[in-house]
C-alpha cells in the first residue's frame, strides 16, 4: 500500500494547518522531516520541520505518530500541525512530493482506507462526509448518528436475520431427503414477514433524511406587490431582492439559503401571480412561480391586507396545503377589527413586514412544518438515494420469496436480499453464511 499525504485543514490563512500522512512510510517520513528517530505513538512533540536536502526550516510544528492499527485509517499515520500560512503549506507540500514513494492523496482516500481496513462500514463513511458538509444543527445530529453506526446497526440487524434464514434453508437443500420441521418453517416465514414490513415502513418515510440532507425548499408566492421580496430580505437578514411599489418587479426566482430552528431552508421568492398580465416575460415568471410552489416542501402564500379580497384567485388558493403558511401582510394599514373571508378557510398570520409586527410567528411556523417534515427521530433515516435504491431492490427480492415454490429459488431470493443490504454497508461475504451453517448444524455427525 502506498503512503499518501494531504492537508486536512482548509488551504489558506488560519491559526493552524493540519497535514496527515498515512501508510507504511509515515514514520520514516516524519523522521526525515524532523531529524529525530525516537517518536513514541500517540504523544505530541514540538519539532522543527525542515527540508531534508537543505535543512531549511519550514516551521516549528506539533507532530504526532499513530501506530497501526490504532489510527483513523488503520495504518501508520502521522499528523503535522503547522501555522496556517499559505507559504508554509506550499513548502511542506513540495517537500513531501520530493520524498520517494509518497504521493498526494486522492479525494476521500483516507476515509476509503479506513473503510478497507474495517474501521467502519460505508454508511458510517457517508455519515462522515455528511458531518463535514453539515451546516445546521439538525443536519449535524443526523450525520453524527450515521457516522457513529446508527444505520449500520439497523442494516446489520436485517442482514443477520436473513443470514439465519439462508443457513436454515441451505441445510435442507444439502439434505433433500429430510423434511423441514414445521417450527423452522414458521420461524422462517415469521422472520421474512417482519423484515418485509420493517423495510416497507422504512422506505415509506417521505424522504425525511434526504430532505434534511439536501434542504427543504420554501417558496414565497402570492399576488404582485404583497411584500414577498421584503419578507425574503427579512428572512435572509440582507437585501437580496429588489423591493418596489411597482407590481411585477420580481420576474425570475430569487433564491437564498438559511437555517431556521436547525433546519436547512432553501428560500425562493417568486413573481407575483395574477391572471391579467399581458407581459410575456411576466407571464413566464408567473409560470415559474407556480411550478416552484408545486415542488416546494413548504409554501408561504402572502396577501396584501388592503387588496386581499380582490387579489385572491384559484391559481393561488389551489396551491395551499397542510404545509402552507398563509400570511396577511401590511396589517398596520387596516383597522384592527377588520376581518377577511379567507380567515374562515385557512389559519392566517397577520403581520407587517415593513414594521416588524409578528414576524417571529412566521419563523416559528416554518420551524414547526420543517420539524414535521424532517425532524430527527429515534429511528435513523435513509439519507441518500443509494440506500433507497438498494433497499427497494432488497424488498423486491423479499416479495418474490416463496417457500411453496422451489427451495433453491427461495433461498436465492434471500441471498440476493442480503447482497443488496451488503451493497449499502459494503459488507458482502459468503464465509458468513458458511459460518452460520456450521455453527447451527452438526454436519456429518
Curated annotation (Swiss-Prot):
Top-level EC class: hydrolase
Chain sites annotated for binding GTP: 225-230, 244-250, 269-272
GO cellular component: cytoplasm
Keyword Acetylation included in the entry's annotation: no
Cofactor comment: Binds 1 potassium ion per subunit.
Xref: Pfam families: MMR_HSR1, MnmE_helical, TrmE_N
Gene Ontology MF annotations: GTP binding; GTPase activity; metal ion binding
Subunit structure: Homodimer. Heterotetramer of two MnmE and two MnmG subunits.
Summary of the function given for this chain in its UniProt record: Exhibits a very high intrinsic GTPase hydrolysis rate. Involved in the addition of a carboxymethylaminomethyl (cmnm) group at the wobble position (U34) of certain tRNAs, forming tRNA-cmnm(5)s(2)U34.
PANTHER family: TRNA MODIFICATION GTPASE GTPBP3, TRNA MODIFICATION GTPASE GTPBP3, MITOCHONDRIAL
Name of the featured protein: tRNA modification GTPase MnmE
